[in-house]
């Protein structure tokens, strides 16, 4: 486990929770184990997975893996009414307290699980939260991505991030988690839950 992953695991108290935006292109079949973070330690992400970043540019995971820095991966969606923002805020508060610089020592990757979200939505998300990462280099070290269903499904399956569309709440139900990746794109840890998050 990387120094960064270990620090965040210790710095952010865990509290199991789940939260469910707008209607997806199709309903995700809810399973018994849906809306949970499964153990995916040791899995290496496919570097050919293709997304679009907050600037509207194509972004393949090979732009990060293999690389020189570990990566903190956050999955969720940007129109999430509460929890996704709370996870990001808690992560940024912890990262602001550690003696490591974004871009030099680690990178941050946000990926939306909602295939209807656009680069403009991703850009707005970044503009809202970037000031909370009180570190120089944060803008270039943090990519905020959107993608199609196929690439989203491949990424979430590989990382063990399970979610579904709730017709009851008209939102995505998903686990709060941070996933830690080596510079080679291998999953080495996950933080399941962040203190202070509600359902």
Locate the predicted segments by residue.
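Thiol/selenol-based redox catalytic cores and closely related redox-interacting motifs
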Residues: 132-199
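Hydrophobic h-region of N-terminal signal peptides that target proteins for export
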Residues: 8-18
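Extracytoplasmic
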Residues: 44-46, 66-70, 103-108, 139, ...
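N-terminal "domain-start" segment that seeds a small globular fold
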Residues: 26-63, 86-96
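Short active-site neighborhood of thiol/selenol oxidoreductases, capturing the structured segment around
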Residues: 61-91, 108-110
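Sec-dependent signal peptide recognition
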Residues: 1-7
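Structural microenvironment flanking redox-active thiols in thiol-disulfide oxidoreductases
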Residues: 88-152
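Cleaved targeting-peptide boundary
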Residues: 18-27
């Amino acid at each position: 486990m990387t120094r960064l992953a270990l620090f965040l695991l210790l710095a952010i108290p865990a509290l199991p929770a789940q939260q469910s935006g707008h209607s997806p292109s199709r309903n995700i079949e809810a399973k018994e184990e849906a809306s949970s973070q499964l153990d995916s330690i040791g899995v290496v992400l496919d570097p050919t997975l293709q997304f679009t970043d907050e600037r509207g540019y194509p972004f393949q995971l090979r732009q990060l893996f293999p690389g020189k820095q570990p990566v903190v991966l956050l999955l969720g969606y940007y129109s999430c009414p509460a929890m996704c923002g709370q996870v990001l805020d808690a992560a940024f508060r912890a990262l602001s307290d550690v003696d490591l610089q974004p871009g030099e020592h680690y990178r941050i990757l946000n990926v939306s699980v909602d295939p209807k979200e656009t680069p403009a939505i991703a850009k707005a998300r970044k503009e809202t939260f970037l000031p909370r990462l009180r570190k120089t280099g944060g803008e270039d070290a943090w990519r905020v991505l959107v993608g199609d269903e196929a690439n989203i499904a491949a990424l979430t399956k590989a990382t063990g991030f399970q979610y579904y569309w709730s017709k009851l709440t008209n939102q995505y139900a998903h686990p709060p988690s941070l996933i830690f990746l080596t510079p080679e794109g291998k999953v080495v840890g996950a933080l399941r839950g962040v203190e202070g998050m509600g359902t």
